[in-house]
Regions:
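Conserved catalytic or regulatory cores that recognize and/or transform ribose-phosphate-containing ligands
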Residues: 1-114
């Protein structure tokens, strides 16, 4: 690995990446993609949603149940969650993910102030 020309901050970060799971309404697909890139470039390992059902991805009711449960497992894997709450919007699914994360001792950060 070539780390000769990187800052001390980056050198200290290597191998110590925090894991963050993105939560929020899948209607905000562009925000998910932007935040994922921003957090990755800040040194986070980012776990995101697997499908954007509210942005046009076709998802059956059965798949929705599976994806909701799978997202809770993604929260389990993370150190924290990052809530994409564009214009202050937090839907029922996102609210349940926030409660789940808090009940499991995860730090919760919001894209916009609540």
């Amino acid at each position: 690995m070539l780390i000769k020309n990187v800052s001390a901050e980056v050198k200290n970060m290597i191998g110590k990446y925090e894991v963050v799971t993105l939560c929020g309404s899948t209607r905000f697909k562009d925000d998910f993609n932007r935040v994922q890139k921003e957090l990755t470039l800040k040194g986070y390992i980012v776990i995101s949603v697997g499908s954007f059902g509210h942005s046009g991805d076709a998802v059956t009711d059965e798949q929705k149940v599976m994806l909701d449960d799978m997202h809770k497992r993604k929260i389990d894997m993370a150190d924290s969650i990052f809530v994409i709450n564009k214009n202050g919007y937090i839907g029922k699914s996102t609210a349940s993910e926030i409660a789940y994360a808090e009940n499991h001792g995860k730090t919760v950060t919001y894209m916009e102030s609540c």
